[in-house]
Regions:
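Extracytoplasmic "Venus flytrap"
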Residues: 16-38, 62-69, 91-94, 159-167, ...
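Beta-alpha junction/loop-to-helix N-cap segments that form part of ligand/metal-binding clefts
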Residues: 30-37, 51-122, 132, 191-199, ...
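Periplasmic-binding protein-like
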Residues: 78-91, 111-113, 157-160, 210-220, ...
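An alpha-beta-alpha
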Residues: 128-190, 213, 308
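Extracellular/periplasmic bilobed ligand-binding domains
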Residues: 170-268
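Extracellular/periplasmic periplasmic-binding protein-like sensory domains
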Residues: 227-302, 313-318, 368-393
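Segments of small-molecule ligand-sensing domains
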Residues: 288-298, 307-374, 394
Length: 394
């Protein structure tokens, strides 16, 4: 049965094993599949140059279905039956917290890639968990600062998924918006469950509330379904929309010409940002292997593998304590630009982009235009804030 759960390239027994967990089915599958592909590309590149410490990397992959218990079960199987050296991946924020707890108990390093709750590297921090991707504070704060430039936006409404990610994003967005505009009002909120089929009641509630702007943290297939259902009601013309991860290329491709123009959106990485040689090389290699533009999730999977590989090389060993020490403060030049795993909290520190949806004749889908880049120091929670959170949890 176990052989049916895991897919991996066949290597010798002395490979360095990464136990990958990704949603490979259902509405979250675009995130999981492309994250897995990005990780596979990194493994291929590193192995083509001899691997690490003379050993090949091996990525095991399993469908965690974006389910918390599934992630816990897979993590334990990977460690106890497959003998993985690292846990890797995860899209669901709730799932990442559960996997991090397994990593802590088993004393195995977990490299989170997509799941972005601040709680993972802040209130529930543990020394075995690192994040190679963006966290909620970077995302929500950047969106709030970008939206604050529009002085006509005073009344805000929320629609977000009813779990850790959605609720945290709304609280962070409100706090930063209130800081920028003390007169801002937050007039309502809606919390649909993940993966529901019908958003009609939520759309009608938004129309009745008549906000100036809606903050939306639906993502992946849920965001695609919501936009398709909401567009006939004219909601995207009647109010401004601020959509976290709305610049996701997998969402843009799924919607095609149905994507509304002028949405304020973010993306943790974009295939034409930054315009660097490193990013251009990544896009070229990814498109050669997968015949598609890389998503942010692909970049986060790719980055996570490179962080682990460089740390193992730096440590000169697979000893957990030595690899942790090598990961702490590690800085790499990645497709997203220069990025550092902060020593204190193990959170990735890198620049962040927000813009608006536009159409460009060069692409068959909407892209992110009118972009503004926010330095990590301006939007990521500070080390002092992290220390206060740690003290409060003792």
């Amino acid at each position: 049965m176990l052989a049916l759960l895991f897919a991996a390239t066949s290597y010798a027994a002395d490979t360095i094993k990464l136990g990958g967990m990704f949603p490979l089915s259902g509405r979250a599958s675009d995130l999981g599949i492309t994250c897995k592909q990005g990780a596979e590309l990194a493994v291929k590149e590193i192995n083509s140059k001899g691997g690490v410490l003379g050993r090949k990397l091996e990525l095991l992959s399993a469908d965690d279905k974006a389910n918390v218990q599934e992630g816990v079960t897979l993590s334990k199987r990977y460690i106890q039956k497959d003998g993985v050296n690292f846990l890797f991946g995860v899209v669901s924020s709730a799932g990442s917290l559960a996997v991090a707890e397994v990593a802590k108990q088993e004393k195995v390093i977990f490299m989170d890639t997509v799941a972005s709750t601040d709680t993972l590297t802040k209130e529930k921090w543990n020394r075995y968990t690192f994040r190679a991707g963006t966290c909620n504070s970077q995302e929500a704060n950047s969106l709030a600062l970008y939206a604050a430039k529009n002085k006509k936006l005073a009344k805000f409404y929320n629609i977000g998924p009813d779990y850790e990610y959605g609720r945290t994003m709304w609280e962070l967005f409100k706090a930063k918006t209130k800081e920028q505009n003390p007169k801002a009002q937050f007039i309502g909120e809606q919390w649909p469950k993940l993966f529901i089929p019908d958003y009609t009641s939520y759309i009608n509630a938004i129309l009745q509330a008549k906000p100036d702007a809606v903050f939306c943290s639906l993502w992946g297939g849920d965001l695609v379904a919501f936009i398709k259902q909401a567009k006939p009601y004219g909601v995207f013309d009647k109010m401004k929309w601020i959509i976290a991860t709305g610049g996701d290329v997998t969402v843009a491709k799924a919607l095609g010409k149905e994507m509304p123009v002028g949405l304020i959106v973010d993306q943790r990485y974009y295939f034409h940002w930054p315009n660097s040689k490193r990013n251009q090389e990544f896009v070229k290699a990814y498109m050669a292997d997968f015949k598609d533009y890389p998503s942010a999730w692909a970049a986060e999977g790719y980055d996570g593998v490179y962080f682990l590989a460089e740390a193992i090389k730096k440590a000169g060993s697979l000893d957990t304590d030595k690899v942790i020490a090598a990961l702490e403060g590690l800085t790499l030049e990645l497709p997203r630009g220069k990025a550092t795993l902060r020593k204190e909290d193990h959170q990735l520190s890198s620049d962040f982009m927000v813009g608006e949806t536009v159409f460009d004749k060069a692409y068959p889908f909407a892209i992110v235009g009118k972009a503004e880049v926010f330095p990590a120091a301006k939007v990521l929670y500070s080390v002092d804030e992290w220390k206060k959170a740690q003290a409060a949890n003792k």
